Amino acid sequence: MDFLKKSLFLVLFLGFFSLSICEEEKRETEEKENEQEDDREERREEKRLLGMIPVAISAISALSKLG
């Protein structure tokens, strides 16, 4: 009976240990994916702002011609 209890305890412990390792790896993967998504969003914002520069320059030149 003690042998069965020890075996069951060992199996449960190892299962819990492997589950915690899997959860940690999953968390790390999600963090990396979130960082990559943040980088993509920053690049999109930079492209959008860079695309607005010619419009701003043309608006300023048009205003300077009027005044």
Swiss-Prot record:
Region (Disordered), start-end ranges: 24-46
Query: Tissue specificity, please?
Result: Expressed by the skin glands.
Q: Where is the composition biased (Acidic residues)?
A: 31-40
Q: Does the keyword Signal apply?
A: yes
Give the signal sequence positions. 1-22
User: Keywords in UniProt for this one?
Assistant: Amidation, Amphibian defense peptide, Antibiotic, Antimicrobial, Cleavage on pair of basic residues, Cytolysis, Fungicide, Hemolysis, Immunity, Innate immunity, Secreted, Signal
InterPro entries linked? Frog_antimicrobial_propeptide (IPR004275)
One short Pfam name that applies is FSAP_sig_propep
GO CC, one annotated term: extracellular region
User: Where does the record place it?
Assistant: Secreted
Q: Which domain of life is it from?
A: Eukaryota
Family designation: Belongs to the frog skin active peptide (FSAP) family. Medusin subfamily.
Free-text function comment from the UniProt entry: Antimicrobial peptide with activity against Gram-positive bacteria (S.aureus, MIC=32 mg/L) and fungi (C.albicans, MIC=128 mg/L). Shows weak hemolytic activity.
Also noted in the record is:
The primary structure of this peptide is identical to that of Phylloseptin-s5 from Agalychnis sauvagei (AC F7UI88).
Protein name per Swiss-Prot or TrEMBL? Medusin-H1
Record organism: Pithecopus hypochondrialis (Orange-legged leaf frog)
